[in-house]
């Protein structure tokens, strides 16, 4: 028997262990270094429940309704209940779509459900049986629902919704596709196995959800990798290599840009504010799919952070990422 005292090499593996039905799954990560599975499990759980993006109805315009406290003849639910039902509709959009209007128009009696929406290519209603309203007698019922991609801020969305037309009603959107997360740790002797229970709304695959959570968490902590404590050993004064302004280390994903703008910058490998400020307006306009509206949005974000375009920072990425 070989007496090898070198540290065991861990070859990580993530896989779907079990499909429990009703969009509930078990995802297994192994092997995990001894003592780290609980830390990893807690981190994955918190990110899954707080930080994944998704699509949600953000506003609705119902025919013959002026405000959310209205009632409709021959409709069992009031408008507040209808809006609450619309919030529960699970919508999956192609990555190229970040906002669109969905139309619903029926003339019947009985239950109006999410399956009555007219969908186009790249749009899928997951829970078609989700009730929206109940028509007690045959009548016309129509509405326009605006769907947007976003990410919750805190528990639910805090993103303002523009009400442009008479009768527009804001919906308290819940963008997060994850509904429940739990985890369990198994001891393998010299390593651990982490099993994550994930319940989604059906718009995201479980492995993709866990992978995105890990990627997002890594992005958030990566900015601290280049931090160092001064050689005098004082613990209360943490310095950043090359005295970079900390605001420049802010990840682009934290700027609450629209999905289109964020995707354009990500495709250009612009990860931090420090990357972004080094571009000029003309350089940004050359980025594929980044138009004038996105440029104005980016400029406003920079103004809000007391920054501007066209700033030169020598070797910024190398200094930040230690390359």
UniProtKB/Swiss-Prot annotation:
InterPro entries assigned: DNA-dir_RNA_pol_insert, DNA-dir_RNA_pol_RpoA/D/Rpb3, DNA-dir_RpoA, RBP11-like, RNAP_asu_C, RNApol_insert_sf
The answer to keyword Transferase applying to this record is yes
For this protein, the record's SUPFAM superfamilies field holds: C-terminal domain of RNA polymerase alpha subunit, Insert subdomain of RNA polymerase alpha subunit, RBP11-like subunits of RNA polymerase
UniProt record, GO biological process: DNA-templated transcription
Reactions catalysed, as given in the entry: RNA(n) + a ribonucleoside 5'-triphosphate = RNA(n+1) + diphosphate
Q: Which cellular component appears as one GO term in the record?
A: DNA-directed RNA polymerase complex
Which EC class heads this enzyme's classification?
transferase
Q: Name one Pfam family in it.
A: RNA_pol_L
Q: Give one GO term, molecular function aspect.
A: DNA-directed RNA polymerase activity
Segment Alpha N-terminal domain (alpha-NTD): which positions? 1-228
Keyword set for this entry? DNA-directed RNA polymerase, Nucleotidyltransferase, Transcription, Transferase
Q: What is its EC number?
A: 2.7.7.6
- Region described as Alpha C-terminal domain (alpha-CTD): spans on this chain: 244-323
* CDD domains xrefs: RNAP_alpha_NTD
This protein's domain notes: The N-terminal domain is essential for RNAP assembly and basal transcription, whereas the C-terminal domain is involved in interaction with transcriptional regulators and with upstream promoter elements.
**Which purpose does this protein serve, as stated in its record?**
DNA-dependent RNA polymerase catalyzes the transcription of DNA into RNA using the four ribonucleoside triphosphates as substrates.
Stated family = Belongs to the RNA polymerase alpha chain family.
Subunit record text: Homodimer. The RNAP catalytic core consists of 2 alpha, 1 beta, 1 beta' and 1 omega subunit. When a sigma factor is associated with the core the holoenzyme is formed, which can initiate transcription.
Identification of the protein by name: DNA-directed RNA polymerase subunit alpha 1
Instruction: Give the species this sequence originates from.
Output: Francisella tularensis subsp. novicida (strain U112)
Q: What's the encoding gene here?
A: rpoA1
